[in-house]
Amino acid sequence: MATFLMFGKYTAQAMQEMSPGRTQKVRDKVKELGGEVKAIYAVLGKKDLLLVVNLPGIEAAMKASLTLSKMTGISFTTSPALPVEEFDKLIGQV
C-alpha cells in the first residue's frame, strides 16, 4: 500500500451538504476502493481538509480522488507521500 495526502477545498455545494455522517461515508468509500483512511484533519489556510490514506497505488488514488469529489462536492488535490525513513534510504543510494 502507498500513502497519499488528499488536500480538500470546500466548494459551495460541499458546504451545503456538510454533516458528521459524511466523514464515515468517506471512510467507507476509501475502504470499498481497497484503501484505508489513516487520519482526517480539518485545517486552516488554502485547504480545508487533509486526509491521510493508504491505497494500492496511483490508479486507486486517482479513483478515490475523483469518487470522493463527486460524492462530497469537495475539490481534492492528491499527492503521494513517502515516509522520511524511506526517503533517507534513497538519499543513501545517491
Regions from the language model: what does each represent?
Residues 15, 37, 68-72:
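Hydrophobic alpha-helical elements and their junctions with loops/disorder across both membrane
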Residues 4-8, 41-66:
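Short, well-ordered beta-strand segments in beta-rich or mixed alpha/beta enzyme
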